[in-house]
């Protein structure tokens, strides 16, 4: 069986602006604009300022301009996006925290930073009605303060030092004990609010990928604006961590599993599991932010867990896995380990030397040096530049492709 594991690099290779910064730059433009009457993608991405700021958007606009001009937005979608942007605390935090070219893994790290800071601050202020900032790192205070939980600051001099005491908004406190009139910080309510806001932010991403990416690309394929794309023509199964349907547009007959959800359905946006999740009594305060929790709740991994893995484990034939456009970051360690373990041969496609170095570094982080050496010896692990990847459309061509790799 021939498998492919896809990441966001696949969409980027098609000229689609699907990186985190592409999404955020577009959201920034919409919010800053005085108008919400844009009719098409072209009306927004034609902005010289936006195209100068973001090369992915500029290149996509040049490549798919005719499509972007021809497809109207659904009624009211830009107004709905703008309304959510104005209120969403995650968008406000992220757009105010940095302005650099980052990817999805970096966004997961931002979520992790927020979880770490809230965990530290909330646990240290348990049973208190307010937060004493003097005992916390500046980073933790900055993050908590960014989410609008805190009210006025009172400066109190104590032992020749100044303490900064911040009250917490009343709706995020609870009376304990009941009837006492004494209110303390309601940790559960704060965490629930953070998660609800993250899901609202996720809905923005859904809308972006739907109207700015999926719909125009499907039309571009329909109008044959995309050249012949046969790299994975003889693939039997695809496991993608992308939300888009670009692969299905190019290969409609191939079965695709969207492990992290897909446009038009629930999508997963969170942080990876860690060793603490395997403790006998793990802390579950922030479990809803974990990707494995969301996969279980939203059922995005059902086909993968209960159909594909069982099929692979019981397969009598050779299993060949190709990886394209996925960084192999430790954040997806559980998926990578499972797929690598059931595969007989693994080919990782890379587009440049720095990407190759990143893949090797990440694999060492996941498997360790000895584990990586063992993979190379027992799993026939190879790295192949995309420039040498043949466009195979038959089983024989694919076997020839892997035979050539074995000689390199």
Please tell me what each predicted stretch does.
Residues 225-232, 307-315:
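Short boundary motifs at domain starts and secondary-structure transition points
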Residues 1-14, 20-26, 30, 35-52, ...:
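SIR2/sirtuin-family catalytic core signature
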Residues 296-307, 326-330:
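A general structural motif
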Residues 40-301:
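Extended, H/D-rich, highly charged conserved domains that either
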Residues 19, 270-274, 352:
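Intrinsic-disorder/low-complexity, polar/charged segments
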């Amino acid at each position: 069986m021939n498998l492919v594991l896809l990441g966001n690099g696949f969409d980027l290779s098609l000229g689609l602006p699907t990186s985190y910064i592409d999404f955020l730059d577009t959201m920034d433009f919409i919010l800053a604009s005085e108008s919400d009457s844009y009719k098409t993608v072209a009306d927004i991405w034609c902005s010289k300022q936006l195209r100068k700021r973001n090369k992915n958007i500029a290149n996509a606009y040049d490549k798919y301009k005719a499509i972007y001009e021809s497809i109207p937005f659904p009624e009211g979608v830009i107004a709905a996006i703008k309304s959510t942007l104005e209120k969403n605390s995650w968008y406000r935090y992220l757009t105010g925290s940095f302005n650099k070219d980052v990817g999805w893994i970096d966004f997961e790290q931002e979520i992790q930073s927020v979880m770490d800071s809230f965990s530290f601050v909330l646990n240290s202020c348990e049973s208190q009605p307010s937060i004493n900032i003097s005992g916390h790192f500046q980073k933790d205070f900055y993050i908590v303060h960014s989410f609008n939980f805190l009210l006025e600051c009172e400066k109190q001099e104590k032992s020749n030092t100044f303490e900064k005491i911040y009250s917490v908004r009343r709706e995020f406190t609870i009376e304990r004990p009941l009837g006492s009139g004494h209110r303390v910080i309601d940790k559960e309510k704060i965490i629930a609010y953070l998660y609800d806001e993250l899901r609202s932010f996720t809905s923005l991403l859904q809308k972006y990928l739907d109207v700015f990416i999926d719909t125009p690309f499907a039309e571009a394929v329909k109008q044959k604006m995309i050249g012949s794309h046969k790299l994975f023509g003889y693939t039997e199964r695809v496991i993608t961590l992308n939300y888009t349907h670009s692969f299905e547009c190019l290969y409609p007959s191939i079965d695709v599993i969207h492990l992290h959800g897909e446009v038009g359905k629930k999508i997963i946006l969170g942080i990876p599991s860690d060793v603490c999740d395997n403790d006998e009594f793990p802390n579950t305060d922030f479990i809803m932010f974990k990707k494995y929790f969301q996969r279980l709740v939203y059922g995005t991994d059902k086909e993968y867990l209960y159909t594909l893995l069982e099929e692979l484990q019981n397969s009598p034939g050779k299993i060949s896995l190709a990886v394209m456009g996925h960084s192999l970051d430790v954040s997806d360690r559980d998926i990578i380990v499972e797929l690598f373990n059931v595969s007989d041969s693994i080919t990782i496609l890379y587009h440049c030397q720095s990407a190759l170095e990143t893949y090797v570094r990440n694999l060492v982080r996941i498997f360790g040096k000895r584990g990586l050496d063992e993979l190379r010896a027992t799993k026939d692990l190879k790295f192949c530049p995309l420039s040498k990847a043949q466009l195979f459309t038959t089983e024989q061509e694919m076997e020839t492709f892997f035979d050539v790799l074995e000689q390199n």
